[in-house]
Amino acid sequence: MKAALPTALFALGTLLAGTARATTIFTPPLVPGGNNLLDCYLVNVSDEPRNATIVAVDRDGNTVKSVDVTLQPGAEAVAQATASENARYCRFEVDGKKAHFRASILVVQDGVGSVSALAGQ
């Protein structure tokens, strides 16, 4: 019985060491009016592929859009919501440290481009 305990502890330690650390990044709120869009952008700035979920959230905390992605190094992804969906901020659930990602929220106007942008923290 005594020999089983060190083996079990070693196995548990190995399992925990290999588990990716999840981090959540939030943006400040922006309001896309009229026909504008709200974009939740995420870029992987690390040197290995990373999994993430990009979520556009309304003022009541409800999910408006959700996108699950695996981002290669240097790759980006976006969750986009229309003004009529009442999205207000973005939540990024990422595997890794905040330093592995750059996140932002943008209001995009058709024919113009981004008219407002804020960084996630």
Language-model regions, residue ranges each:
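Bacterial N-terminal signal peptides
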Residues: 8-15
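Gly/Pro-rich, tryptophan- and cysteine-flecked surface segments typical
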Residues: 20-121
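Bacterial N-terminal signal peptides that target proteins for export
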Residues: 1-8
